[in-house]
């Protein structure tokens, strides 16, 4: 696929996404080799498309590509953590949480991610509340 064809397809995909036509956006996304794309923001958007369609593992795989392109992005690390929870991979979510805290020690989203991990683990309500009160 050349650059022109890639640009046309991504514009169509983004138009469908804007109209909340997630299935059509996913069909276009399926036709693109995302390993060749260097734009982490575009990869993040494609991951969201797969997430909207309930394909969490595919979305996570695309996010890993984005993380390779932008390893210092706290947004990508946070989304990796939430997607890991959606596929019930608590260990990976915990790793993402630890990485997120290193990248953004003052970001309040770390407490939300910690709470989500505790809730998925079935921790006591007291522990969950404590995580949010921090």
Positions of predicted regions on the chain:
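Conserved structural position within tetratricopeptide repeats
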Residues: 31-34, 64-68, 101-102, 134
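TPR-repeat structural position
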Residues: 22, 56, 90, 124-125
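Register position in tetratricopeptide repeats
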Residues: 18-19, 52, 86-87, 120-121
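Start-of-helix register in tetratricopeptide repeats
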Residues: 7, 41, 75, 109-112
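Canonical tetratricopeptide repeat
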Residues: 45, 79, 113-116
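Alpha-helical segment of the N-proximal tetratricopeptide repeat
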Residues: 5-35, 45-52
């Amino acid at each position: 696929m050349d650059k022109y064809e890639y640009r046309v397809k991504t514009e169509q995909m983004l138009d469908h996404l804007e109209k909340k036509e997630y299935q059509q956006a996913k069909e276009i996304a399926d036709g693109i080799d995302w390993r060749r794309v260097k734009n982490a923001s575009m990869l993040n958007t494609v991951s969201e498309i797969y997430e909207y369609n309930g394909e969490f593992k595919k979305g996570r795989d695309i996010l890993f590509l984005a993380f390779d392109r932008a390893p210092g992005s706290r947004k990508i690390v946070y989304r990796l953590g939430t997607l890991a929870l959606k596929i019930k991979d608590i260990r990976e979510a915990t790793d993402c949480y630890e990485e997120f805290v290193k990248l953004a020690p003052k970001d309040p989203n770390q407490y939300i991610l910690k709470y989500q991990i505790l809730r998925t683990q079935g921790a006591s309500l007291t522990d969950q509340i404590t995580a949010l009160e921090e």
